[in-house]
Design a protein with these regions (language model features):
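Conserved "HGTGT" condensation-loop signature of ketosynthase/thiolase-family condensing enzymes
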Residues: 2-124, 128-149, 179-264
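Active-site-proximal alpha-helical scaffold in enzymes
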Residues: 78-81, 151-175
């Protein structure tokens, strides 16, 4: 494929596991009790514990009329993105927002209102779509470039990385990858297959030859599922892998095996 770096080529799974590579040139994150970078670094080096608490970033610079529309999960995602969205060429940098569940609590409330024949709030309805946080960020920060929102089951982070690698291969100088999730409503408790705690993080991704933490990610089909992490949901465990400095992280979910590797 002329003009496409070898590390961005998605190989046929019948021939060999597919693989991508990229550099993480910066990161930021927010969760209750972990508002600062040094808090996250200390958390990653210690025993795995889940973020707990009811706090949310204040977003004091956002006009009150807009700030009232942004729920807790959205505030966390916007705050994490803000600290990474620092490039002078920001309009040329796509954003990939990924959340396994999104604002499912808002959707449940809308369904409850429908079930009781109550009128739906137009604002609540508009904010229930999966790309609502991405759209709010583009409005609040006047970002007019490319953004998209994904959900892909347990391996949502990995699939978002594949999307980001494709954008880099297509010529984007960097890509911002924003991952966020929160607790599930009680009505879904019987279906939860991993822990669920509030968090948001953002990685700034670039080509693998750029300075930063160079990671590779390969995947292959037909892998038996592994037991989920009893403490951290998968998206949070991947961020801990980046911060802790581990050489490898292997995950098997939904008949797919994903292998994270650190280089250099």
């Amino acid at each position: 494929m002329p003009g496409v770096p070898e590390s961005f080529i998605f190989r046929n799974k019948a021939a060999a596991p597919a693989m991508i590579e990229f550099s993480v040139t910066g990161w930021s994150a927010w969760a209750p009790g972990l508002p600062l970078a040094q808090d996250w670094l200390a958390w990653a080096q210690g025993e795995a514990t889940a973020p707990v608490g009811e706090g949310a970033p204040p977003l004091a610079d956002v006009p009150p009329v807009m700030r009232r529309r942004i729920d807790r999960l959205g505030r966390m995602a916007i705050s994490a993105t803000d600290d990474c969205d620092i490039s002078p060429a920001r309009e040329q940098i796509p954003l990939v927002f990924v959340s396994r569940h999104g604002d499912v609590a808002g959707s449940v409330e809308l369904l409850r209102a429908l079930g009781q024949a109550e009128p739906l709030s137009p604002t609540a309805f508009s904010l229930s779509v999966h790309n609502a946080v991405a759209a709010l960020y583009s409005i609040v920060r006047k970002r007019h470039g490319n953004y998209l929102a994904l959900a892909a089951g347990t391996a949502s982070v990995e699939n978002a990385c594949v999307e980001a690698a494709a954008l880099l291969a297509d010529g984007a100088p960097e890509v911002l990858l924003v991952c966020y999730d929160g607790p599930l409503p009680e009505v879904y408790a019987d279906f939860a297959d991993e822990p669920a705690h509030p968090y948001a993080w953002c990685w700034r991704l670039a080509a693998p030859d750029q300075p930063g933490e160079r990671l590779s990610l390969c995947w292959e089909a037909d892998a038996p599922a592994a037991a989920p992490d009893p403490v951290l949901q998968h998206g949070l465990a991947v961020h801990r892998f980046l911060l802790k400095g581990d050489a490898a992280l292997d995950v098997a979910v939904e008949d797919q095996r994903w292998r994270w590797r650190r280089h250099g």
